[in-house]
C-alpha cells in the first residue's frame, strides 16, 4: 500500500493564528485562549448562518493583524465549514482579495486546510498560505440533525458542536511551531448511521490515520507527549482506545480529544440560546425556537437546558 505520510525536509512554520469563540466556549477550561469572544450567537446578524460567517471573517482579520500582515501578503486562503456549499466560509471571506480554495472535510476541515497549506508552502507553490474554518452549534444542529425549533431530545451519545472559528498562516520559513509532516487519511465507513453518535462514526477513520502514520514512520505513541484528535468526545475516544488495544497500539496514556477539552463536563451544563417571545414565553430546544424575525441587538440570552 502506498504511504500516506509525507515528512517535510524543511518544515513550514505556523507564523500566526487566531481563535474566535462563543459564550459557552469562553466559559470552558480554554476560554482564556480565545482572541475574541462573542456572547451574541447571531454575531450582530439576523441568522445563525450569517453569524457563522462572522466567525471566519473575524478570525482571518485577527490572524493577519497579530502578525502585521496585509491581504497582499497572502498567496492563498484554504477554508471550509460544515454547511452546504461552504456558505459560512464563502460569505465570511468574500471581502478579502486573496485567492481562495474551498474545501469540505466536515470535522477535519482545519486539519486538511493546514495539511494543504503546509504542502503548498513546503513545495514552493505559495509563500504564505492561510487556513480557516468554523462551526456553530445552531447551524450544525439544523444541518445534520433537527432545527432547534423542532424541540427534539438529545440522546446521551449526542455531541455539542462548538461555536468557534480559527485561522492560521503557514510560511516556508519562521519560528516554531513547525509542521514536520502530514498524513492523508482514508475513508473508513463502519456503517454507523446515527447522526447523534458521531463519535462512533469517526473513531475508526481517526484510528486508521493514526495507525498509518506510525506504520509509515516507524514511530510509536510513546514518542509523543500527546496524540490529539478533534472531536471524538467520550464515546469516540473510548472506541479509539479499544481499537488500539486490539492491535497493540497503546493510545490510552497520551491521547487527548479537543471535544472533551474545550468544555468542563462537570461544571458546564448544556446551554441553549433563547429569545423572549412576545407573550413572555422562553424558548429553546424544548420550545418554539423563533429567530427568523429577530433583529440585531434584540433580547438574547442563555437558557439552561
Positions of predicted regions on the chain:
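A generic, well-ordered mixed alpha/beta core segment in the N-terminal half of proteins
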Residues: 90-142, 146-158
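Glycine-/small-residue-rich "gating" segment that lines the acyl/pantetheine channel
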Residues: 3, 109-112, 142-178, 263-267
